[in-house]
From Swiss-Prot:
It comes from Listeria monocytogenes serovar 1/2a (strain ATCC BAA-679 / EGD-e). This is UDP-N-acetylmuramoyl-L-alanyl-D-glutamate--2,6-diaminopimelate ligase. ATP binds at G108, T109, N110, G111, K112, T113, T114. Pathway: Cell wall biogenesis; peptidoglycan biosynthesis. Meso-2,6-diaminopimelate binds at R383, D407, N408, P409, R410, G458, E462. InterPro entries: Folylpolyglutamate_synth_CS (IPR018109), Mur-like_cat_sf (IPR036565), Mur_ligase_C (IPR004101), Mur_ligase_C_dom_sf (IPR036615), Mur_ligase_cen (IPR013221), Mur_ligase_N (IPR000713), MurE/MurF_N (IPR035911), UDP-N-AcMur-Glu-dNH2Pim_ligase (IPR005761).
Length: 491
């Protein structure tokens, strides 16, 4: 593609655009530059790409996009916001793939991963080829690709959408993080349905205030365009029980569909019954009333199913098909996942890493726990410190036997993180500290008896632990199974 054609994607810029320069590749990482590359200088949180402009030229870059002055021998085009420019250029370069896809974006503090997997499976069971982008992986049809972030950078994202189209995918479902929205990673993506799950404290190391965090989430709905006169209008699916849904509604001109339990909603659950094996509830919808029996446990699971069914309705999938699919799904890896190894007590691994997420899971366990509740929990290093004492307080308030431990300490001292946590706990409260996460899990398993419940919270599906600069193998599910087998004399 000629540079002058590609630059049609950006309405305002300065610098001369050659009609002869051919662009065969776009990169923001100088290590990925090859001959024919348009190199985009991104001033990031850790690295400033402007410092690598000269290196990009050495490797074969033929033009540069920049915000700040760079002194190189090839054409430089200056823009106000290079992150947003990159998203627009990526969309144009890869042929605006989301205009041909049905695209669903799901945002919120908790529930994004589960809902995205539920919606993807519903659409697939309806006979369509699907794509999925989220916390655990990217998926194109049946092909699984690794992912580093919940929402990839805009170049990777648009390339993935293009590859989905080439593979016959008709509907793509993705988790949309607040970081991605603020950083413009999804700018230029043409969403058909946007889903808001909930908002509770998380990422305040980045957003600083809940107001900023909420505004970040609302960007997805502001991006959901006005399309009153099309056959497929844009739709916002909102949680009627979360007060921040009002903000999301004000941000968009799209049609609104609501779901909820407490407030009146288009998709409303009632008569909810929770057991250790699943949940049942009555569902009111615009097309009739139904009774559901799902294998997932807890009110938060009911919310996730409501969101998935409401989204399926927005995608014109028959209600009976959506219900049949969600009733057949056992759950998502690392989300209230039961570990069975012959023990007489439930061991649950869950990704709950926010105060609200931990509270939801512990409240659900309280519905069926017969005796003691053990919770193994820590907090991530180099992340929102404000939630640490809240997590500890919830643990001691809702579990009989809280055990504080390491999560992903990253560059922080694990003990210092735990000290931050116990600031939220009165001195009289009983808790145990095992800094080593493996030891904490084994302690809980060795203490537990029939009728007790163990929750291992915070890491869920993750099969690694980040300690300093090292990424080591560590899977809560594997560690729990090993501990159980040792207790039972099976290992």
């Amino acid at each position: 593609m000629k540079l002058n054609e590609l630059m049609q994607a950006i309405p305002v810029f300065t610098g001369e655009v050659s009609e002869t320069i051919e662009i065969s590749h776009i990169a923001q990482d100088s290590r990925k530059v090859k001959p024919g590359t348009l190199f985009i200088c991104i001033d990031g949180e850790v690295v400033d790409g402007h410092k690598f402009a000269s290196r990009a030229v050495e490797l074969g870059a033929v033009a540069i996009i920049a915000e700040k002055q760079v002194d190189v021998s090839i054409p430089v085009i200056y823009v106000r916001d290079s992150k947003r420019a990159m998203a627009m250029l990526a969309d144009y370069f890869y042929g605006s793939p989301t205009q041909a896809l049905k695209l669903v974006g799901i945002t919120g503090t908790n529930g994004k991963t589960t809902v995205s997997h539920l919606v993807e499976q519903i659409v697939r069971e309806n006979g369509e080829q699907t794509g999925l982008i989220g916390t655990m992986y990217r998926k194109i049809g049946d092909q699984i690709l690794e992912t580093k972030n919940t929402t990839p950078d805009s170049l990777t994202l648009q390339e993935t959408f293009r590859d989905m189209l080439l593979s016959g995918v008709s509907t793509a479902v993705m988790e949309v993080s607040s970081h991605a929205l603020v950083q413009g990673r999804v700018y230029g993506s043409d969403y058909d349905v946007a889903v808001f799950m909930n908002l509770s404290q998380d990422h305040l190391d980045y957003h600083h205030t809940m107001e900023e965090y909420a505004n970040a989430k609302s960007l997805l709905f502001a991006q959901l365009g006005n399309s009153y006169h099309t056959s497929n209008p844009k739709i916002a699916v909102l949680n009627a029980d979360d007060a921040e849904s009002v903000r999301m509604q004000k941000a968009t001109a799209a049609h609104i569909i609501t779901f909820g339990i407490k407030q009146e909603a288009d998709f409303q659950a009632s008569n909810i019954k929770i057991t250790s094996h699943g949940s049942t509830f009555d569902l009111g919808t615009p097309v009739g009333n139904f009774t559901l029996k799902i294998k997932m446990i807890g009110n938060f699971s009911v919310y996730n199913v409501l969101a998935a069914i409401a989204t399926s309705f927005a995608l014109h999938i028959p209600m009976e098909k959506a219900i049949k699919t969600v009733e057949s799904i056992p759950g998502v890896k690392g989300r209230f996942e039961l570990v069975h190894a012959g023990q007489e007590f439930p061991v649950i691994v869950d990704y709950a890493h926010t105060p609200d997420g931990l509270l939801n899971v512990l409240e659900t366990i309280d519905e069926f726990a017969e005796k003691r509740v053990f919770v193994v929990v820590g907090c991530g290093g180099d992340r929102d410190k404000g939630k640490r004492p809240q997590m500890a307080k919830i643990a001691v308030d809702y579990a009989t036997n809280p055990i504080f431990t390491s999560d992903n300490p990253r560059s922080e001292n694990p003990r210092a993180i735990i000290e931050d946590m116990i600031q939220g706990v009165p001195e009289s409260d009983a808790y145990v500290v095992h800094e080593n996460r493996r030891d904490a899990i084994r302690f809980a398993v060795n203490q537990a008896e029939a009728g007790d419940v163990i929750l291992i919270a915070g890491k869920g599906h993750e099969d690694y632990q980040v300690v300093g600069d090292e990424v080591i193998d560590f899977d809560d599910r594997v560690e729990a199974r090993i501990a159980i087998e040792k207790k039972l004399g099976l290992a």
